[in-house]
Amino acid sequence: MAKYLAQIIVMGVQVVGRAFARALRQEFAASRAAADARGRAGHRSAAASNLSGLSLQEAQQILNVSKLSPEEVQKNYEHLFKVNDKSVGGSFYLQSKVVRAKERLDEELKIQAQEDREKGQMPHT
C-alpha cells in the first residue's frame, strides 16, 4: 500500500513539474516577444517612456490623440486641464495625469523632429 502511495506521489510531482516547466518556457517566450516589440519602438522613445513613467500609447489615450500633431495635443491638453481643475470640482490626480501625458507627447514630438532633421542632413549616396 505504501509503495503505491509513493508511486502516486512521485507521478503527481512529475506532472506538476512538467506543467511548471512548460509554463515557465511560455512566460520566457512572451517576455522575449514583449522585449523585442519594445526594442523596435526605438531607444529614444523607450528612454522617454522610462523618464515620464508613461508609454506613448498611454499618453495618447489620456489626451485622446490618435496622431501626433502639436495643435491637437495642445487643444486636448487645455480642455482636459480646465475640466479637471480642482476649483471647478475636478481631480488633481487626473489633472496631473494630463500634465504627464502632455510632457510625454511633447518629448515624442521633439524626438520625431530631431530624427527628421537627422534624416534630412544625411548625404544621399
Curated annotation (Swiss-Prot):
Keywords: Disease variant, Dwarfism, Membrane, Mitochondrion, Mitochondrion inner membrane, Phosphoprotein, Protein transport, Translocation, Transport. Residues 58-110 are annotated as: J-like. Ubiquitously expressed. Induction: By CSF2/GM-CSF. It is a peripheral membrane protein. GO terms for biological process: intracellular protein transport; negative regulation of ATP-dependent activity; ossification; protein import into mitochondrial matrix. Its main location: mitochondrion. The modification Phosphoserine is found at residue 69. Changing residue 93 to G: Partial loss of protein translocation into mitochondria in a heterologous system. Substantial loss of protein translocation into mitochondria in a heterologous system. Loss of DNAJC19-binding. It is found in: Mitochondrion inner membrane. Gene3D superfamilies: DnaJ domain. The J-like region, although related to the J domain does not have co-chaperone activity. PANTHER family: MITOCHONDRIA ASSOCIATED GRANULOCYTE MACROPHAGE CSF SIGNALING MOLECULE (PTHR12388), MITOCHONDRIAL IMPORT INNER MEMBRANE TRANSLOCASE SUBUNIT TIM16 (PTHR12388:SF0). This is Mitochondrial import inner membrane translocase subunit TIM16. It comes from Homo sapiens. The lineage of its organism: Eukaryota, Metazoa, Chordata, Craniata, Vertebrata. The gene is PAM16.
